[in-house]
UniProtKB/Swiss-Prot annotation:
Keywords in alphabetical order: Acetylation, Coiled coil, Membrane, Protein transport, Transmembrane, Transmembrane helix, Transport, Vacuole
Gene it is expressed from: SYP22
Residue runs in coiled coils: none
Protein family per UniProt: Belongs to the syntaxin family.
Region of interest: Disordered: 1-23
Tissue expression per record: Expressed in roots, leaves, stems, flower and green siliques.
Residue(s) carrying N-acetylserine: S2
Protein's name according to its UniProt entry: Syntaxin-22
Originating organism: Arabidopsis thaliana
Cytoplasmic side: 2-246
Quaternary structure (record): Interacts with VTI11 and SYP51 to form a t-SNARE complex, but not with VPS45.
Function: May provide the t-SNARE function in the vacuolar assembly. Promotes the formation of vacuolar membrane 'bulbs'. Required for inflorescence stem gravitropism.
Length: 268
């Protein structure tokens, strides 16, 4: 099941299921679709890091997108575990088990893409500093620039004072940008760890579902073998019955001939 047909195919694949089982499968399919869309957006934002478009606003958008995807991953993982637990109950349609196993593999694939994008984001956010437009600098910057060429001595002293204020403000501003960047990097690494843990749990779940699907396949193969064997036995029984019927007819004919000969002899 590809990501392109998740939205169109999930309805057909789960419509036959009823109650909560249908809801859990649909929720997983919807979650995977949203994660895949979010990861595509996240990758485009990551590719912008280190370019002139890399601004604090872009970093903030990247941060929000990353948190949104992380929440979707947690919710979808919980729904998938719920669906998997349901699949282990008796009386569950085998088609649902197969559909859930495919969704688990799709979830695993999109998580790999998210992990790669997270790693790239961490590397680029560590390497590059966001570009800060002049309009974002402290307001005292303009005043300092105006007073750079004073006509009087008092104005020159005031200009120097303004330059010192500007320097202090700019240093404080840069420190705030650096602190915000470091905080973002820490959050990335924290989320990478969380996604890695979910990925490990998912690998166990996928393996478990693979064993379950193999059991379903073995059961189907055994049923087919038993059906084929039953047909063979029926054919053999039919042949035996036909052979017995032919032998009975032959014996009746022989008995009739013998009886006819005896009657002829007695009549003579």
């Amino acid at each position: 099941m590809s990501f392109q047909d998740l939205e169109s195919g999930r309805g057909r694949s789960t419509r036959k299921f009823n109650g909560g089982r249908q809801d859990s499968t649909q929720a997983v399919a919807s979650g995977i679709f949203q994660i895949n869309t979010g990861v595509s957006t996240f990758q485009r934002l990551v590719n912008t890091l280190g370019t002139p478009k890399d601004t604090p606003e872009l970093r903030e958008k990247l941060h929000k997108t990353r948190l949104h995807i992380g929440q979707l991953v947690k919710d979808t993982s919980a729904k998938l575990k719920e669906a998997s637990e349901t699949d282990h109950q008796s009386g569950v349609n085998p088609s649902k088990k197969i559909a859930d196993a495919k969704l688990a593999r799709d979830f695993q694939a999109v998580l790999k893409e998210f992990q790669k994008a997270q790693q790239t984001a961490a590397e680029r956010e560590t390497t590059y500093t966001p570009f800060v437009p002049q309009s974002a600098l402290p307001s005292s910057y303009t005043a300092g620039e105006v007073d750079k060429v004073p006509e009087q001595r008092a104005q020159l002293q005031e200009s120097k004072r303004q330059e010192l204020v500007l320097l202090d403000n700019e240093i404080a501003f840069n420190e705030a940008v650096i602190e915000e960047r470091e905080q973002g990097i820490q959050e990335i690494h924290q989320q990478i760890g969380e996604v890695n843990e979910i990925f490990k749990d998912l690998a166990v779940l996928v393996n478990d579902q693979g064993v379950m699907i193999d059991d379903i396949g073995t059961h189907i193969d055994n049923s087919r073998a038993a059906t084929s064997q039953g047909k063979s036995q029926l054919v053999q029984a039919a042949k035996t019955q036909k052979s017995n019927s032919s032998l009975t007819c032959l014996l009746l004919v022989i008995f009739g001939i013998v009886l006819l000969i005896v009657i002829i002899v007695l009549a003579a």
